[in-house]
A protein has these predicted regions:
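Conserved nucleotide-binding/hydrolysis micro-motifs of P-loop NTPases
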Residues: 17-21, 165, 189-190, 285-286
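Active-site regions of enzymes building and remodeling cell-envelope glycoconjugates
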Residues: 10-12, 289-303
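Accessory nucleic acid-recognition modules appended to NTPase machines
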Residues: 67, 72-240, 244
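Hydrophobic/aromatic beta-strand patches that form the interior of the parallel beta-sheet core
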Residues: 11-13, 62, 183, 230, ...
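Catalytic cores of nucleic-acid endonucleases
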Residues: 257-295
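Interdomain motor-coupling "hinge/lid" segment immediately C-terminal to the ATP-binding subdomain
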Residues: 1-122
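Conserved catalytic cores of phosphodiester-cleaving nucleases, focusing on short active-site segments
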Residues: 218, 222, 240-259, 278
């Protein structure tokens, strides 16, 4: 049986990040949301100048994340990343660790919670396509970490998505609870833990965790609108990053950090399960072709 650990109500409220929609409103105002919604619904490209500005804001959001204190700081320095105070997010992480020790009286469980949390950033792109306890600690087994995992989920510090064994309704009946992926609740915290060079993000350079960061960002945005999120893989190498259920049924979502046109796994899923359409989230403009709806990374929050 999983033990229940109390989580401070005030701390939980304070730790919830702003999503990118809220970040956009704070930077450009409400009107931009309605403009984006029109282009999203009609799959028509937005003007290049606005597209590029929104991509720049997306990359800025990757750096600072959505924690209110972090957003307030970047806005106070007119969005100048060189003047941004990185210590704000580091202090938030320290606060998380303090909460663990405050509310979890069992020292062993505290260590397990911290070990899971610290292992997530480097497991997002795990080649095994699932979270592995052996990556948390050598010889670790799931039964020993079940309580620690539940504490992190209950505290909303992390999000979990389960493997969907078959794309059938209801999806909850076809998920594999033993095979899952974990994401951090805030992409800014992820970048802080990984100690990513902000210049690489802002200038859209290639670096080792670029794809993983984009996926964590997308999961964070989807998590606002969907109670259940899944992923899919076959017995070979094909994998679809996210599966959501909306009014159109089960919809596969592929994430690309750049503007890659390749969608091998997404196309394979579409051929096999015949969804109404698939979604590709990348740095390209809005569009629709061959059954795939292309959505810019900055418009992920519009998926509902």
């Amino acid at each position: 049986m999983v033990k229940a650990f109390p989580v401070g109500k005030v701390d939980m409220i304070n730790m919830q990040p702003m999503d990118f929609e809220e970040f956009l409103i704070a930077t450009l105002g409400q009107d931009i949301i309605e403009i984006l919604r029109e282009h999203y619904e009609n799959s028509t490209p937005i003007v290049d100048a606005m597209h590029n500005e929104l991509l720049s804001l997306y990359r800025l959001y990757l750096c600072v994340g959505g924690m209110p204190a972090s957003v307030n700081n970047i806005l106070s320095v007119d969005r100048d990343i060189l003047k941004y105070n990185k210590k704000i997010v580091k202090n938030i992480i320290s606060g998380y660790l303090s909460d663990m020790k405050k509310y979890v009286k069992d020292a062993t469980e505290t260590i397990r919670i911290e070990n899971i949390y610290n292992s997530i950033p480097t497991q997002i792109g795990n080649k095994s396509n699932k979270f592995q306890y052996s990556k948390v600690r050598s010889g670790a087994r799931s039964k020993n970490y079940e309580t620690a995992l539940q504490w992190l989920l209950s505290s909303k510090m992390i999000n979990r998505i389960c493997l969907l064994k078959s794309a059938q309704n209801p999806p909850e009946a076809f998920k594999d609870e033993e095979v899952f992926k974990l994401y951090l609740s805030d992409v800014g915290i992820l970048n802080s833990i990984l100690d990513i060079n902000f210049e690489d993000i802002i200038l859209d350079q290639e670096f080792i965790y670029k794809g993983d960061i984009a996926k964590n960002y997308v999961e964070q945005q989807l998590n606002v609108n969907f109670e259940h999120i899944y992923y899919w893989k076959n017995n070979n190498t094909a994998e679809v990053d996210f599966i959501i259920k909306n009014k159109d049924g089960l919809i596969p979502i592929e994430v690309k950090a750049g503007d890659s046109v390749k969608s091998k796994s997404l196309n394979l899923y579409i051929q096999q399960f015949k969804p109404k359409y698939g979604i590709k989230i990348c740095s390209k403009n809005f569009g629709f072709a061959n059954g795939i709806k292309t959505i810019p990374l900055y418009a992920t929050f519009l998926i509902k």
